[in-house]
Amino acid sequence: MADLNNNLLSPNGKNIALTKTENFQSNPIQISKIIELGDIKVGYLMYNQFTLGFDDDLNEVFSNLKAEGISELVLDLRYNGGGLVSSAINLSVMITGQFDNEKFASFIYNQKVMNVYNSDEELKSRLNLNFTNQLGDGSTINSLNLNKVYIITSNRSASASELVINGLSPYIDVVQVGDNTYGKNVGGPAAVYDYIDNEGNKNPEHTYAIKPITFYIANGDGFYEYA
């Protein structure tokens, strides 16, 4: 350690040992609490990323909010730059719950790709992302059945965060508070890593990957022009 005096660092003889935590993953559920305003119970949730592996934790948070009988929800997405589309849908269902199997969002590709999808009913159904009442593991989603949600945003709120706002807008009253969001209304498949061969061997000389942008993502009304 060192002391700072007059913008100069001088060793102070103190040593601190740090232990590295393997495979550490930050919990995106930053804050969850209930604010009582007279007779009204308001739930407040700061959620910072739509991350794999935290949908169960988020579902438990909504179970607690539901048990406490909140009637209003403030969702803080100021620091949420996006993540998994599936998690964005799950969060949206936790807020609502009354729109099971309705269209939440849909993919819009270029015309050649759309022609392929539209040529077959089964393929065409893959373009739509619907509200569901279950998580991926089959467990029931805890829903608040709200008709209004307040969402706090910043210019760092992007992608899946914007999908929640846009996807819910045709169904409930979404009150956006704060700055305009980033404006990422597109997506694509997982990055193409050509340095990994079919046997899983890596070529260390390959240092670039391709992440193609292949689709817009629209809400149930077909709107996606918010970039």
Please state what every model-predicted region is.
Residues M1-I70:
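C-terminal, low-ordered peptide segments at domain boundaries
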Residues D39-L45, Q49-E72, G81-A227:
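C-terminal "post-core" interaction segments
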Residues R78:
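Short strand-turn motif at the edge of the Rossmann-like AdoMet-binding core
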